[in-house]
């Protein structure tokens, strides 16, 4: 047990305070916690209460860090967890912060996948999109659901437009039709389109049957 002898607002951050017990600096925390916990000068505090305050303060810092992160750019749960881990927060604290954001729909992998797919379909095929979302930690169930909604005809039309633009650039530099076809095919594959789609488009643009 000890007696709180001083509570001082920090000079560099007015939202945080330094708490002194028996004239010695003991801990710093968010000013909000002082009011929530009913802490005031001359009150008595024990070690367990201090530990609880420090733990809650860590959660507030983690939560605020998470909020700042998603304000800058939308994240998947895995991406946010990795960011918070890099900053040194404990797993239990990170879990609480993530649950807080999910409660207010500020973290939603399903919504993220929808937005990501809609944006990337303008320049990528479903295979590249799929593997990118896997790396971002989106679950298989969400992936299967969202990728199944992609309109194959629209995807193929986009692939053709990209290939046509690339073809017009390549044909100025490559006179060998076979090599040109190979380069165009690899270009489409790198964009995430499947074999049949790539083959069909290359044949349409070059009249080259080598893929068959």
Swiss-Prot record:
The keyword Magnesium belongs to this UniProt entry's keyword annotation: no
Chief location category: cytoplasm
GO biological process: regulation of DNA repair
Keywords: Cytoplasm
Cell location: Cytoplasm
Domain of life of the organism encoding this protein: Bacteria
A Pfam cross-reference name: RecX_HTH2
GO cellular component term of the entry, any: cytoplasm
Cited function: Modulates RecA activity.
Family: Belongs to the RecX family.
Name of the protein in question: Regulatory protein RecX
Record organism: Clostridium perfringens (strain ATCC 13124 / DSM 756 / JCM 1290 / NCIMB 6125 / NCTC 8237 / Type A)
Source species taxonomy: Bacteria, Bacillati, Bacillota, Clostridia, Eubacteriales
């Amino acid at each position: 047990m000890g007696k709180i002898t001083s509570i001082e607002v920090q000079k560099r951050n007015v939202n945080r305070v330094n708490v002194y017990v028996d004239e010695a600096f003991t801990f710093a925390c968010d000013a909000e916690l002082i009011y929530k916990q009913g802490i005031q000068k001359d009150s008595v505090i024990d070690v367990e209460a201090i530990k609880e305050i420090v733990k809650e303060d860590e959660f507030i810092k983690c939560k605020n860090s998470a909020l700042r992160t998603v304000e800058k750019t939308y994240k998947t749960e895995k991406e946010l967890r990795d960011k918070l881990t890099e900053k040194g927060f404990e797993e239990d604290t990170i879990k609480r912060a993530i649950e807080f954001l999910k409660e207010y729909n500020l973290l939603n992998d399903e919504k993220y996948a929808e937005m990501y797919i809609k944006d990337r379909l303008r320049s990528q095929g479903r295979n590249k999109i799929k593997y990118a979302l896997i790396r971002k930690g989106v679950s298989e169930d969400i992936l299967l659901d969202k990728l199944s909604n992609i309109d194959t005809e629209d995807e193929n039309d986009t692939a053709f437009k990209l290939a046509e633009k690339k073809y017009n650039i390549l044909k100025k530099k490559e006179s060998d039709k076979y090599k040109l076809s190979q380069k165009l095919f690899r270009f489409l594959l790198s964009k995430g389109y499947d074999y049949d789609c790539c083959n069909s488009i290359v044949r349409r643009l070059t009249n080259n049957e080598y893929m068959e």
